[in-house]
């Protein structure tokens, strides 16, 4: 069972060719977050998608994106939002097209829309699949997702159904259920783990709400000791939780530039490209419109450099999507005395 250890700081160093492009050329893209749609049938109060509009990518636009990603030698696509990916009428079409373009696929979903047809598509094509549950009770689910107890029960059943489909097909998809931690949600952590394990997921994953600094490491260690076994793991964005301790003592990020924006990007459901998933629809972070330019033209153009120089990292969410990339790449850029003496 292969489970993502969420060690982005180590992963970026595996892409030596991309790092060479970073210093010498333009084909730096490794991973792209793709919003198939801005439509969603949940009402999460803290949603980063903000329900900006009801835009949806057409089949023709998805074709163009697949070609663009292949031309840029992009490696992975995360289907996320924006909205809920499975709300797109072209979900299956997009999955097949992107796979044929050589992309490894991951899916982040609220999980409520699943049926057997979707389960099979996901189990046969995704490297990983994460359902965002964020609760161990119906009351917490309503608070975080804005949905009723019947929807919570349906999602729990869908988790169990997908686990069965995965087993039946012999799928290698890494299947987990996510939980965002904060002072509000911490009381549901154990109940969440118990529910997820009982329904057959491979792992439970903990991540902090953006800018939340709650230390859950002691609780996490307790839960791992109590619930982990050969078939079920508890994982977390450890690098973020560990770095939070440092941020509580020192507000310095360790970098002033968003180097990570060259390696990780966002294509939104209105066919536009953005420097950061946290700032979809922010003019300051707008890189280009795929109606007017190819992805390669955007990466070779002046605008991406202007955005890079204009972003003030001190004003960004702490421990953002590109934080770990930025720390590593900042260190690569530092002058080192007597570097020849390892």
Predicted regions and their residues:
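Radical SAM enzyme [4Fe-4S]-AdoMet core and its adjacent flexible, acidic
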Residues: 1-8, 35, 57-60, 64, ...
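Conserved Radical SAM active-site core
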Residues: 53-108, 112-124
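Residue-level recognition of short loop/turn positions
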Residues: 43, 82, 110, 269-270
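Hydrophobic packing within well-folded, soluble alpha/beta domains
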Residues: 40, 44-47, 94, 98, ...
